[in-house]
Amino acid sequence: MEGELTFRPATKADASALAVLVDIAGEGLPAHLWSTLKVPGQSILEVGRERAAREEGGFSYRNAIVAEIGGEIAACLVGYRLDDPYDLGNLAEIPELVRPLVFLEGKAPGSWYVNVLATFPEFRRQGIG
């Protein structure tokens, strides 16, 4: 590991790195979901970046902490406290692929939810996670 390992709250400027790390953690599931949201001329990663740059929502830079080594983003954690009571909302409006995850979230109201924990490949096996 070259450079000092530091942790800090994510900023909007980190949205691109967060989108890539979220997709790494989700093993392509986020990219699949983002592909259903993109408009013509927009890349899947741009959708992820826009979602990470939001001020609200579970996947927002406001819920993320980044790990840096030598000033370079190496990893991230996205997490937040689940609402209590937890409102599942209208499951029909949620992509079918993630409905089971939302249902499981509803089983643990008020708990701390780790949505994403991911490290870029070149920084793995260094104890960051």
Annotated model-derived regions:
Residues A64-E68:
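Cytosolic beta-strand hydrophobic patch enriched in CBS
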Residues G26-A52, N63, Y86-G89:
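Conserved GNAT-fold acetyl-CoA-binding loop/helix
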Residues F123, G127-I128:
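Conserved acetyl-CoA pyrophosphate-binding loop and the N-cap/start of the following alpha-helix
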Residues M1-S16, I24, A31-T36:
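Conserved N-terminal entry element of GNAT/NAT acetyltransferase domains
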Residues V78-V116:
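Conserved acyl-donor/pantetheine-binding loop and adjacent beta-alpha core of acyl/acetyltransferases
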Residues E72-A75:
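Glycine-rich acetyl-CoA-binding "A-motif" of GNAT/NAT acetyltransferases
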Residues A10, L117-T119:
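Hydrophobic adenine-recognition pocket in adenosine-nucleotide-binding enzymes
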